């Protein structure tokens, strides 16, 4: 069997979960704030609207032959002017995901 030729290619951009959307006294766990690497303005966020997110984590018990599980989400809109996005996941992200990495995929494309 032949080995892989050339460099590995990532088909996603890394993002960091900052926390839940919140006000002074309430937090809204159905919406999460994500900082995407290399995105610093509200205009750059517009390209990521509708793109898929994946929070991948490791669980203790095996399901479907794997210890790894995934919660899928979608970028919904910008949050502020500094490149942070609001996103909705199929189930609310667990508290241990704060500060963790998410994958921001390049699809569905709107070009």
UniProtKB/Swiss-Prot annotation:
Any Pfam family hit: Ribosomal_L35Ae
GO molecular function: mRNA binding; structural constituent of ribosome
Cysteine disulfide links: none
Keyword Iron tagged: no
Keyword Ribosomal protein: yes
Keywords tagged on the record: Ribonucleoprotein, Ribosomal protein
Biological-process GO terms, alphabetical: translation
Cellular component terms (Gene Ontology): cytosol; cytosolic large ribosomal subunit; cytosolic ribosome
Record family assignment: Belongs to the eukaryotic ribosomal protein eL33 family.
HAMAP family in UniProt: Ribosomal_eL33
Record's protein name: Large ribosomal subunit protein eL33x
């Amino acid at each position: 069997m032949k080995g892989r030729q050339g460099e590995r290619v990532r088909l996603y951009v890394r993002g960091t979960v900052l926390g839940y959307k919140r006000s002074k006294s309430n937090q809204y766990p159905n919406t999460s704030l994500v900082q995407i690497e290399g995105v610093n303005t509200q205009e750059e966020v517009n390209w990521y609207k509708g793109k898929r997110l994946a929070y991948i984590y490791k669980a203790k018990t095996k399901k479907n032959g794997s210890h790894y599980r995934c919660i899928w989400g979608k970028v919904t809109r910008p949050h502020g002017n500094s490149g942070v996005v609001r996103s909705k996941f199929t189930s609310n992200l667990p508290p241990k995901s704060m500060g963790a990495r998410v994958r921001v995929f390049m699809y569905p494309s709107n070009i």
